[in-house]
Amino acid sequence: MDASAALSELFRVSTQVVEAVVTGPGGDVEAARTSSDARAQALAGVGAEVLSRVAGMRAGEPVERVQVDLDGGSLVALTDGARTVVATTVARPTAALVAHDLRAALGRIEGGAR
């Protein structure tokens, strides 16, 4: 399945994800479900930055997921080492369920890390 189809499936099964973007190993947007291309690029950039900053605080330990809770929802960035999915959610999401849904979306993409 390609990244676009994986995002379509994510939105079919998840009621808590509002928007999402998948980036490839180089950080390029492979697929997005956002209001605009500019929003997709911004979301991808913020996700990469959050993962990078947290990884820098962990002394060499890999970081798979970061969740930032905001007033109106959350930002969740999750990586499998090859691709990254960054999503915004409804307010007070079920964190483990969102993480599961994002991990499953990455797992559906052909050529990704398993």
Regions found by a protein language model. Give the residues of each.
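Non-catalytic interaction/Regulatory regions outside core domains
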Residues: 1-114
